[in-house]
Structures are given as structure tokens and as C-alpha cells.
Design a protein with these regions (language model features):
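Conserved NTP-donor binding/palm subdomain of two-metal-ion nucleotidyltransferases/polymerases, i.e.
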Residues: 1-124, 130-333
Length: 333
């Protein structure tokens, strides 16, 4: 059995083999190596949800079942804590009279009705964008409410795209952004995310979230920040979940930003988008012709699995494995 192909086919948002065939294959799938691969790729909630959809979770390898279930529940509990923090902050910003737009993971979780499975990924913190001329006042107001800096030893970075991270009693990191990236002017970031954004309501609390174009772009740009570990399923997820939903994306604007080198390594971006498209199960639009290149996800996962059958790398070795396998996946196409 090709375990790498099985994982890829199971996680793909569209297309792929029939559910009955996947279910049969999972009954005979190897346990420990796949556990290590899922851990390496950061896709435990995603896999857990898909195995439940297939109705096969209780028929997979017992150790894999126990591990993926426990890991998914642990990460989901963390996500719920972050949701509670976002709800509290939304109320705080309303009381302060400060407009704000929630970014990244929180925004995806708030829009799961528009982007199915968008909440099937661990979220690490709360990122929120506010007007640049109000950011410092908002940050200080949070400090007066009991929030503390997460790292007192870090030197201030006035040029950074967010103020020093804070955390309250929930111990969830909160980053107050003035822009989404250092190469984007604050006023432009506000236009892209807030002005073009949309309101959503949860449990009587109103939030502002970015449009599909910005969620797609931020997933791509954020994923490619560190090229040596950019080609992981958990990072492809952020763009693939938007792509697979069929939500309208301004592809001409995506091309313009690639041409403007908002992502410096355009070649890597083309391969990364090719991988995200395969995972989404979609054909890239004509606007991306010549920009998106094919990426052999099955080869990448297969090479990683070969190593992970023997040992579980960490630190620099983990980064080296991620980088080497991604280079091999790009070289054969």
C-alpha cells in the first residue's frame, strides 16, 4: 500500500478515490510511520475529521487511532480557548470604539460556513489589525486591563508589523498589528483587510474578517516566510481550503502582488501554489498560467515517510528533511 498516496487522497478537499476505497485502505494502513508523518505535517485535526467522515476511525491501527484522536482533541481544546480570547477582544474593541479586523486562523474559524473545514487546523494565537494611529493606544489599553508582554527580554522593534505580543489570563498570545507584513504600508493593509472585509456574527458578537482574496494571499505569503519549512501540508491548508471552497478570489490582484515581489521567491511561490492546488483538488485559473508549476506532493510525502519509518527527526534535522524532500519534489516535474 502507498501510505503517502493514501494520506494525500484522504486529505484532498475535492476529487480523489471513492470513500469506500479509502475506508478499505485505512483498515490496512501502517500505524506508527503514518502517525509520524501526520505529526511532521501538522495535520492531525484535519485527518481526524476526514477519518470520521469516512466512518473508519475505529478501524484504523489502534495506536494511530488513539494518537490522532488525542492530538485532535488537544488541539481543538486550544482552538476553543483562542476563540474565547477573540470573543473577549471583539467586545473590548467595541467598548474602546476601535475598528479591528481579525486575521489568519481566527478569521478562518469564524468563516467555516463559507470555507468548509477551515477550522480543521490548529491556531496558535490571535492576530488583529487596527488602524496604525490607534495601535499604540489599543496596546496600552490592553496592558491596563491586565495583559502582559509574552517576552519581556525581547528588544522593541519599531519597524515590525505588529507591536510586542501580549497575553491575558487565558495565556493566549495576542498580536496587535499595524499591517499584515512589513513590505505592505499600514494604510494599504487596512484597505485590503478591513475596508474590503466582511462582518460575521457569532453568539451575538460581531467580528470583521478579511475577504477570500486576503485569506488566500496571507496563507500563501505566511507559508513561504521560511522557505526551508514552507512545503508542509499544514501550510498548504491555508490556501487550499479557500481555493476548494469556490469563493471568489481576485486572481489579477494575486498576479499583481507576485509581479511586485511581495513574495520574494516567485519560483518557490509557483511550486507552493501548485501543491496547494493539488491538495484543494482544483485546476489553477487561467490568470495564473505560467506562474503556477506542478509539485509532486506524493513524492514529497513518500520520501519523508521513508525517513520517518526509521526515526523521528527534530530541530535542524527536521528542517533539513522538509527542505530536501521539497527540493526533490520540485526537481522531478
Amino acid at each position: 500500500m502507498n501510505s503517502a498516496r493514501l494520506l494525500l487522497d484522504t486529505l484532498r478537499f475535492r476529487g480523489g478515490p471513492p470513500a469506500e476505497r479509502l475506508a478499505t485502505d485505512w483498515e490496512h494502513a501502517e500505524g506508527t510511520p503514518l502517525q509520524r508523518l501526520v505529526e511532521f505535517e501538522g495535520c492531525s485535526i484535519w485527518l481526524y475529521r476526514r477519518l470520521r467522515q469516512l466512518g473508519v476511525l475505529d478501524r484504523v491501527d489502534p495506536e494511530l487511532n488513539d494518537w490522532v484522536s488525542a492530538k485532535a482533541h488537544e488541539e481543538t481544546a486550544r482552538n476553543l480557548l483562542i476563540e474565547a480570547e477573540a470573543e473577549s477582544l471583539a467586545t473590548t474593541f467595541r467598548d474602546l470604539g476601535t475598528p479591528a479586523v481579525f486575521l489568519k486562523g481566527v478569521a478562518r474559524r469564524l468563516t467555516v460556513d463559507r470555507y468548509p473545514l477551515a477550522d480543521a487546523r490548529v491556531t496558535n494565537d490571535v492576530d488583529v489589525l487596527v488602524p496604525v494611529d490607534q495601535a499604540r493606544d489599543v496596546w496600552r489599553a490592553l496592558c491596563r486591563m491586565g495583559y502582559e508582554r509574552t517576552n519581556l527580554n525581547a528588544a522593541p522593534r519599531p519597524e515590525h508589523h505588529h507591536l510586542p505580543a501580549l497575553c491575558g489570563w487565558r495565556r493566549v498570545a495576542v498580536e496587535v498589528h499595524t499591517t499584515n507584513a512589513q513590505e505592505v504600508a499600514p494604510e494599504e493593509a487596512w484597505r485590503r483587510h478591513y475596508v474590503a472585509g466582511m462582518d460575521v456574527e457569532r453568539a451575538g458578537v460581531r467580528y470583521r474578517v478579511p475577504p477570500a482574496t486576503e485569506l488566500f494571499w496571507s496563507g500563501t505569503a505566511h507559508g513561504l516566510r521560511h522557505p526551508e519549512i514552507a512545503f508542509l501540508l499544514v501550510l498548504f491548508f491555508d490556501a487550499a481550503v479557500i481555493w476548494a471552497s469556490g469563493a471568489p478570489v481576485d486572481w489579477a490582484e494575486i498576479v499583481r502582488r507576485l509581479d511586485a515581489k511581495e513574495i520574494v521567491d516567485r519560483t518557490a511561490a509557483g511550486a507552493w501554489l501548485g501543491a496547494a492546488a493539488e491538495l484543494a483538488g482544483v485546476e489553477p485559473p487561467a490568470a495564473l498560467d505560467g506562474l503556477v508549476t506542478r509539485y509532486d506532493l506524493e513524492r514529497e510525502l513518500g520520501l519523508r515517510l521513508t525517513v520517518l519509518r526509521r526515526f523521528r527527526p527534530s530541530g535542524a534535522l527536521r528542517k533539513a528533511l522538509a527542505w530536501w524532500t521539497s527540493e526533490r519534489a520540485r526537481a522531478v516535474v
